[in-house]
A protein has these predicted regions:
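Membrane-interfacial terminal anchoring regions of lipid-handling membrane enzymes
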Residues: 1-848
Length: 848
């Protein structure tokens, strides 16, 4: 078997020998020499158990006329089957306290032979075997995927290594070491340990240093951090509590902790990052038209003095790879990324781990051991000043708007910082904008009520199969940083110190966490990139049939672009440099719009089945135009309105819009912005102003009025949602409906509204928007909840609801009034149907 394996290996493997070739140990030739020179034999030392590596070493030792590695090792009267010693075996299980058999049995026997025979010695020759070139020099992405790393390869990967890298394998014999000298040193300096402990540790460290020269340092947390996490005081205490709580042995509780660590930790490797670099470079150049990056200089400056936590918005699964790619290409360390455990799929999960991903469960409330392990691991990342990345929204946005923040990771980051401050922490909000989405059709289905599908390899392949090779550009814009220490000071929490993982967090720290979350989301929106697709979307979706005369469309695009350029939402906001005509050509190229030729002038229309999807890109930039849109809407609807009335209505609506769209302005800054935008619309002739300062709508059927109507439309669906919910609460009466029921019914009515009146907008299906609205109603004291959980309100609420006539037209108000009117019996049936549907979905998810 060995001979056959060796011959087969010789056909595909030609190792390159590095360094000097060792000489055979000198044998004693006279009786005098024999007394002073111990009899030595050679034993080759390999770090990991690998038959193929042993065969390669055997072949080279025979070729170089050295002692063959697979010949029997004979020392005195003792004989071993081969002259190879493996330091690590596949059956070792990485427990905190390895059992005795974790040491190589052959090493134990050889030590016993030397102790019984003082005249004998063994020369241990450490050998390094590497498959493939250095990751920095490899240009084949497939070979990089299987190039040698610090991780011990599986049998399958080793077979692939042999096939791919047989002609580019490397072997190096290192300086021989006396086993007897190692034993004597161990007995002298570590008398309480088995000599095997010292010898295995010393040789492992030695071979690690040799591999590091070629592969670079081992950055994998799976091998380097696991033990420190498990041995930490907090995790050991959690293991003890788990043992008591679960009535299991300490060993079993320890095994659970080890399982959690293996489930969570990153397995970073340079070859995986290089593989991702080559593969993603190909992706961005072939599938997309490249990646445009703005304001990266901010990050480069911060990296010198701060622990960086990247907090991007979450649009697509591609986000995980995109930001790391951008950072890597600009010479900074790739961040460790917190990824949902739904992505811990076979093969895909390992690739993500190799690029720095670590996995977190969606919920682990009530699991004290998992919580302790995860917090300790996060603390280890921050204490090493390793950059970190997570999505503050928790999941991918299905509507294109920012989702309300999930503060779990943020709170644990602050908690770790307060345990022990290494560097000060800075959050880097990052805007990611696409011009087409891989998951677009999936998002539309989910927002229209289809259950969310669990991630799977099959699902990923299914998505890839549907991909068209026209995706436009990807935009990455780094926003204004958020400094944690500044926010802690604002809430008088800068001197708080937390000693243990399970220490309670003072209210001031919780307030600082919430402030940080909102600041991050507001700064993501400040860094918005207004690209050609989002401009086309916000304009064409504002028309009744999603069509415009081409010349009018060009003028409308120019008007929006000029407004965004002359009155930018923020200094970090980026606006496309393309002209209106170029934007239309770009939309045609991406197959999002079509040109309908006509004798009286060509018409630009949204492509079939693209309207709902384009709401996503409209919503990406809605916050940048919502204030001028609201002004235009109020002026157009009322025909004439004083600046004072305009401001009063906007001040009433602003808290709801701010919470929904994470707008940057404080209430104290709002008046200046209203005046600025109103003046801009007057200067552009979209609205008029009389001698008393009243704002007047342009005359109907004029070009200016048509442009005003288009500008006024984007905000209307938010207003319709608000007043639909207000009408529902008013119709049920004070004390007759709970907040939860309002959220559920508003969501249901939104779906019905969309079907009956063709409101093609996914946000009518988004429960988070209704939850946000109810929350702000409570904060603004329009409603309150009684002891039975029912909503109560007074004349203040009724007066605010009556203000709808200043905002919406009569037809829309009647429609909303009609759709929110139903009997107690109808209400009961609707709630029961929703509860049944939710129970079925929960059961389906549980089975999956």
């Amino acid at each position: 078997y060995r001979r056959l394996s060796s011959k087969l290996l010789d056909l595909v493997v030609t190792p390159h020998v590095l360094g000097e070739v060792p000489t055979e140990p000198v044998s004693a030739t006279t009786e005098t020499e024999a007394k002073t020179e111990r009899q030595k034999v050679v034993c080759y030392v390999l770090q990991n158990h690998s038959r193929s590596n042993a065969l390669v070493v055997d072949g080279e030792t025979r070729r170089l006329n050295l002692k063959p590695a697979l010949d029997p090792l004979v020392i005195g009267t003792h004989q071993e089957k081969a002259s190879v010693l493996f330091l690590q075996h596949n059956d070792e299980n990485n427990l905190l306290n390895p059992p005795p058999h974790a040491f190589p049995p052959r090493l134990i026997k050889l030590i016993e032979v030397l102790q019984a025979n003082p005249e004998l010695d063994i020369e241990l020759v450490p050998v390094t075997v590497l498959w493939g070139r250095s990751p920095d020099k490899e240009d084949s992405w497939f070979k990089l995927l299987f190039s040698d790393t610090w991780a011990t390869p599986s049998t399958v990967k080793q077979l692939v290594n042999i096939g791919l890298h047989g002609r580019q394998s490397y072997l190096e014999f290192h300086e021989p070491q006396s086993l007897r000298d190692l034993v004597e040193y161990a007995q002298k300096h570590y008398p309480n340990l088995s000599p095997a402990t010292y010898i295995v540790s010393t040789l492992n460290d030695y071979l690690d240093r040799q591999r590091e020269v070629v592969l670079g340092p081992d950055l994998s947390d799976r091998r380097n951090v696991m033990q420190s996490v498990l041995k930490s005081r907090d995790v050991q205490e959690a293991i003890r509590r788990e043992s008591i709580r679960g009535k299991i042995s300490m060993l079993e509780a320890e095994r659970r902790a080890i399982g959690y660590v293996n489930e969570i930790v990153s397995d970073y490797s340079h070859s995986a990052v290089r593989f991702a670099d080559l593969a993603l470079t190909r992706l961005w150049t072939q599938l997309y038209d490249g990646v445009e990056v703005h304001n990266f200089s901010t990050v480069r400056e911060l990296a010198k003095d701060y622990e960086i936590v990247y907090t991007p918005c979450h649009r697509s699964h591609i986000d995980y790879l995109l930001l790391s790619y951008v950072i890597y290409k600009r010479g900074l360390m790739v961040p460790y990324i917190a990824a949902g455990d739904n992505l811990n799929l076979p093969f895909v999960g390992q690739l993500l781990r190799g690029g720095g991903a670590f996995f977190i469960r969606r919920s682990f409330r009530g699991n004290g051991l998992y919580t302790s392990v995860f917090k300790e691991y996060l603390y280890s990342i921050l204490s090493r000043n390793t950059p970190l990345e997570y999505f503050i929204e928790g999941g991918r946005s299905r509507t294109g708007r920012l989702l309300p923040p999930k503060t779990g990771m943020l709170a644990m980051t602050v908690h770790s910082h307060l345990r022990g401050r290494a560097k000060p922490i800075v959050f880097v909000p990052t805007y990611i904008g696409y011009e087409r989405l891989m998951e677009g059709s999936t998002y539309v289905g989910e927002m229209q009520g289809k259950p969310k599908e669990a991630e799977s390899i099959f699902g990923i392949l299914k998505t890839l199969r549907k991909i068209e090779r026209i995706f436009g550009k990807v935009h990455v814009n780094f926003g204004e940083p958020v400094f944690l220490d500044d926010l802690l000071k604002q809430h008088n929490a800068e001197n708080v110190y937390i000693e243990k993982n399970d220490d309670p967090v003072p209210p001031a720290v919780s307030e600082a966490v919430n402030s940080s979350a909102n600041a991050i989301l507001e700064n993501i929106n400040r860094a918005v990139v207004i690209n050609p697709v989002s401009l086309l979307s916000i304009i064409l979706l504002a028309t009744p049939k999603h069509t415009l005369d081409e010349e009018i469309c060009i003028k409308q695009l120019e008007a929006y672009r000029n407004l965004a350029s002359n009155f930018p939402y923020d200094q970090r906001t980026e606006v496309t440099p393309l002209s209106g005509k170029e934007i239309i050509a770009y939309g045609l190229k991406l197959k999002l719009i079509k040109r309908v030729q006509h004798a009286l002038g060509d018409i630009i229309a949204i492509e079939d089945n693209q309207a709902v999807l384009l709401t996503y890109f409209r919503n990406n930039i809605l916050h940048a135009f919502v204030l001028p849109s609201l002004i235009a809407s109020l002026v157009e609807h009322n025909g004439k309105i004083s600046r004072a009335d305009l401001s009063n209505v906007i001040y009433t609506l602003y808290p709801f819009l701010k919470a929904e769209l994470f707008l940057k302005w404080k209430s104290s800054e709002l008046k200046e912005q209203i005046e600025q935008y109103a003046d801009a619309l007057v200067q552009s002739n979209l609205i008029q102003q009389d001698d008393e300062g009243n704002l007047i709508s342009s005359a109907p059927n004029t070009e200016e009025h048509n442009q005003l109507v288009v500008l006024a439309t984007p905000v209307k669906q938010s207003l319709e949602r608000y007043y639909m919910t207000l009408a529902l609460i008013t119709q049920r009466g004070s004390g007759n409906i709970s907040a939860k029921q309002v959220e559920e019914l508003s969501h249901l009515l939104g779906q019905r509204l969309s079907v009956l009146y063709e409101f093609n907008s996914p946000e009518f299906f988004d429960k988070a928007l209704f939850q946000s609205f109810i929350k702000v109603l409570t904060q603004q004291n329009y409603i309150r909840t009684n002891d039975q959980g029912q909503i109560e309100f007074d004349d203040n609420f009724r007066q605010m609801a009556a203000g709808a006539q200043l905002v919406l037209d009569e037809v829309t108000l009647q429609m909303l009034q009609h759709i929110t009117t139903f009997t107690d019996e109808e209400l009961k049936e609707a709630l029961e149907a929703m509860a049944s549907q939710q129970a079925k979905r929960r059961l389906k998810r549980k089975k999956a």
